Amino acid sequence: MNLSLIRSMTRSAVFELENGLCFRPAHPFVVTLNGKTVYEACNTNVFSLFSLLPGTEYTVGVQAEGETLSLTFVTEAETFFVDASRYGLVADGETDNTGKLQAALSTCPKGGTVYLPAGRYRTASLFMKSNTTLYLEKGAVLLGDNDRTHYPILPGV
Protein backbone atom coordinates (compact mmCIF):
# COMPACT_ATOMS: atom_id res chain seq x y z
CA MET A 1 0.00 0.00 0.00
CA ASN A 2 1.21 3.52 -0.80
CA LEU A 3 -0.03 7.06 -0.11
CA SER A 4 0.65 9.63 -2.84
CA LEU A 5 -0.04 13.31 -3.35
CA ILE A 6 -1.94 13.92 -6.59
CA ARG A 7 -2.07 17.72 -6.35
CA SER A 8 -1.41 20.38 -3.75
CA MET A 9 -3.09 23.75 -4.23
CA THR A 10 -3.20 26.91 -2.11
CA ARG A 11 -6.05 25.83 0.16
CA SER A 12 -6.62 22.16 -0.64
CA ALA A 13 -4.82 18.95 -1.58
CA VAL A 14 -5.79 15.66 -3.26
CA PHE A 15 -4.33 12.26 -2.33
CA GLU A 16 -4.56 8.65 -3.47
CA LEU A 17 -4.32 5.53 -1.37
CA GLU A 18 -2.78 3.04 -3.79
CA ASN A 19 -4.05 -0.32 -2.57
CA GLY A 20 -4.45 -2.41 -5.74
CA LEU A 21 -8.24 -1.92 -5.80
CA CYS A 22 -10.26 0.27 -8.14
CA PHE A 23 -12.11 3.23 -6.63
CA ARG A 24 -12.72 1.94 -3.09
CA PRO A 25 -10.64 0.20 -0.42
CA ALA A 26 -11.67 -3.16 1.03
CA HIS A 27 -12.33 -1.39 4.36
CA PRO A 28 -12.78 2.28 5.30
CA PHE A 29 -9.66 3.97 6.65
CA VAL A 30 -8.80 6.87 8.98
CA VAL A 31 -7.25 10.07 7.60
CA THR A 32 -5.40 12.50 9.87
CA LEU A 33 -3.92 15.94 9.26
CA ASN A 34 -1.09 16.95 11.59
CA GLY A 35 -2.25 14.25 14.01
CA LYS A 36 -5.94 15.28 14.10
CA THR A 37 -8.59 13.02 12.59
CA VAL A 38 -10.18 14.50 9.46
CA TYR A 39 -12.07 11.41 8.20
CA GLU A 40 -12.93 8.56 10.55
CA ALA A 41 -14.11 6.20 7.82
CA CYS A 42 -12.91 7.30 4.37
CA ASN A 43 -14.18 4.86 1.73
CA THR A 44 -12.63 6.18 -1.49
CA ASN A 45 -9.09 5.65 -2.74
CA VAL A 46 -8.85 9.31 -3.80
CA PHE A 47 -9.66 11.92 -1.15
CA SER A 48 -9.24 15.66 -0.62
CA LEU A 49 -8.37 17.92 2.29
CA PHE A 50 -9.83 21.43 2.41
CA SER A 51 -9.52 24.70 4.38
CA LEU A 52 -5.73 24.53 4.37
CA LEU A 53 -3.49 27.59 4.59
CA PRO A 54 -1.27 28.67 1.68
CA GLY A 55 2.48 28.02 1.83
CA THR A 56 2.12 25.74 4.86
CA GLU A 57 3.68 22.36 5.58
CA TYR A 58 1.29 19.59 6.62
CA THR A 59 1.54 15.88 7.38
CA VAL A 60 -1.32 13.67 6.23
CA GLY A 61 -1.66 10.23 7.75
CA VAL A 62 -3.67 7.15 6.80
CA GLN A 63 -4.45 4.19 9.05
CA ALA A 64 -5.63 1.32 6.85
CA GLU A 65 -5.75 -2.43 7.40
CA GLY A 66 -3.30 -2.33 10.31
CA GLU A 67 -0.82 -0.18 8.40
CA THR A 68 0.05 3.48 9.07
CA LEU A 69 1.24 5.68 6.21
CA SER A 70 2.23 9.34 6.33
CA LEU A 71 3.25 11.98 3.83
CA THR A 72 4.48 15.54 4.34
CA PHE A 73 3.50 18.16 1.77
CA VAL A 74 3.44 21.94 1.36
CA THR A 75 0.50 23.89 -0.05
CA GLU A 76 1.20 26.36 -2.85
CA ALA A 77 2.02 29.95 -1.94
CA GLU A 78 -0.63 32.60 -2.50
CA THR A 79 0.23 36.03 -3.96
CA PHE A 80 -3.10 37.73 -3.33
CA PHE A 81 -6.37 37.06 -1.49
CA VAL A 82 -9.66 38.85 -2.06
CA ASP A 83 -13.03 38.25 -0.45
CA ALA A 84 -15.44 38.54 -3.40
CA SER A 85 -18.22 39.77 -1.10
CA ARG A 86 -16.28 43.06 -0.84
CA TYR A 87 -17.26 43.63 -4.48
CA GLY A 88 -20.91 43.91 -3.41
CA LEU A 89 -22.16 40.40 -4.18
CA VAL A 90 -25.58 39.49 -2.81
CA ALA A 91 -25.88 35.92 -1.50
CA ASP A 92 -29.66 35.56 -1.85
CA GLY A 93 -29.72 33.15 -4.82
CA GLU A 94 -31.76 35.59 -6.92
CA THR A 95 -29.65 38.71 -7.53
CA ASP A 96 -27.47 38.57 -10.65
CA ASN A 97 -23.86 38.66 -9.38
CA THR A 98 -22.15 38.05 -12.74
CA GLY A 99 -20.57 41.49 -13.18
CA LYS A 100 -19.39 41.82 -9.59
CA LEU A 101 -17.92 38.33 -9.37
CA GLN A 102 -16.28 38.78 -12.78
CA ALA A 103 -14.70 42.02 -11.51
CA ALA A 104 -13.21 40.15 -8.55
CA LEU A 105 -11.88 37.41 -10.86
CA SER A 106 -10.51 39.87 -13.42
CA THR A 107 -8.60 41.97 -10.89
CA CYS A 108 -7.03 38.99 -9.13
CA PRO A 109 -3.35 38.64 -10.11
CA LYS A 110 -1.52 35.42 -11.01
CA GLY A 111 -1.21 33.12 -7.99
CA GLY A 112 -4.13 34.81 -6.22
CA THR A 113 -7.34 33.50 -4.69
CA VAL A 114 -10.87 34.86 -5.02
CA TYR A 115 -12.76 33.71 -1.93
CA LEU A 116 -16.53 33.23 -1.92
CA PRO A 117 -18.10 32.96 1.56
CA ALA A 118 -21.13 30.77 2.31
CA GLY A 119 -24.26 31.83 0.46
CA ARG A 120 -26.13 31.31 -2.80
CA TYR A 121 -24.82 33.37 -5.72
CA ARG A 122 -26.67 33.52 -9.04
CA THR A 123 -24.43 34.17 -12.01
CA ALA A 124 -24.13 33.67 -15.76
CA SER A 125 -20.84 33.00 -17.59
CA LEU A 126 -17.63 33.72 -15.73
CA PHE A 127 -14.23 33.86 -17.37
CA MET A 128 -11.34 32.54 -15.29
CA LYS A 129 -7.67 33.32 -15.76
CA SER A 130 -4.84 30.80 -15.58
CA ASN A 131 -3.13 30.43 -12.20
CA THR A 132 -6.05 31.95 -10.29
CA THR A 133 -8.10 30.07 -7.70
CA LEU A 134 -11.83 30.49 -7.07
CA TYR A 135 -12.28 29.15 -3.54
CA LEU A 136 -15.84 28.40 -2.42
CA GLU A 137 -16.18 28.14 1.34
CA LYS A 138 -18.35 25.33 2.69
CA GLY A 139 -21.94 26.40 2.03
CA ALA A 140 -21.09 28.62 -0.95
CA VAL A 141 -23.13 27.74 -4.03
CA LEU A 142 -22.91 29.14 -7.56
CA LEU A 143 -26.30 29.04 -9.28
CA GLY A 144 -26.42 29.26 -13.07
CA ASP A 145 -28.75 31.83 -14.58
CA ASN A 146 -31.79 30.14 -16.20
CA ASP A 147 -32.02 32.67 -19.06
CA ARG A 148 -29.94 31.51 -22.04
CA THR A 149 -29.81 35.04 -23.45
CA HIS A 150 -27.60 36.03 -20.49
CA TYR A 151 -24.83 33.73 -21.77
CA PRO A 152 -22.46 34.85 -24.54
CA ILE A 153 -22.11 33.01 -27.81
CA LEU A 154 -18.45 32.50 -28.63
CA PRO A 155 -18.18 32.27 -32.43
CA GLY A 156 -15.63 29.83 -33.78
CA VAL A 157 -15.16 28.02 -30.49
Task: Describe these PLM feature segments.
Residues 1-157:
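Extracellular/periplasmic carbohydrate-active domains that bind, remodel
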